[in-house]
């Protein structure tokens, strides 16, 4: 993703938008509420995680919660995590894991077929008016990430 995106910041924003779409599609496919599932974007090794900042941009934070600059020199291998959001679980994780390819395809279709130009709460989450003025498209960034997810065979994805 880093090579296809002009910056880590844009890659991070793309992952956050993709996670938003995947979260909503997963809840629909699992016939659950979005609050039944949690979502997170972070490093697969647990060195950092991402949140949506008050400025609308993704922010990287280390495990203690301190903000990291997007050009942080550590490994940059973002991942999307969808999980059962109830303490002890209510049985959503295992069937959700088995539907990962369907979730990715559904999220890609959702974002591709949305009528918005830059992104909206129906596809990648709220988009700042300033993004629209600058032509910055969180929707396009999310489509890039989802396209990368969809292009790799599920058999290549990490196993639990």
Model segments located where?
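Extended, highly charged accessory segments
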Residues: 3-160
């Amino acid at each position: 993703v880093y090579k296809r995106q002009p910056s880590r910041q844009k890659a991070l924003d793309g992952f956050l938008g993709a996670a938003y779409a995947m979260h909503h599609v997963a809840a629909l496919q699992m016939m659950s509420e979005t609050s039944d599932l949690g979502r997170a974007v972070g490093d697969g090794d647990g060195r950092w995680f991402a949140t949506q900042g008050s400025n609308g941009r993704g922010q990287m934070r280390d495990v203690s919660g301190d903000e990291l600059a997007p050009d942080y020199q550590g490994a940059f291998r973002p991942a999307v995590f969808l999980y059962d959001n109830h303490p002890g679980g209510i049985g959503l994780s295992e069937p959700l894991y088995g539907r990962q390819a369907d979730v990715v395809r559904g999220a890609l279709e959702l974002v591709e077929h949305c009528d918005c130009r830059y992104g909206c709460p129906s596809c990648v989450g709220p988009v700042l008016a300033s993004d629209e003025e600058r032509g910055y498209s969180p929707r396009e960034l999310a489509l890039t990430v989802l396209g990368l997810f969809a292009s790799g065979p599920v058999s290549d994805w990490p196993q639990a």
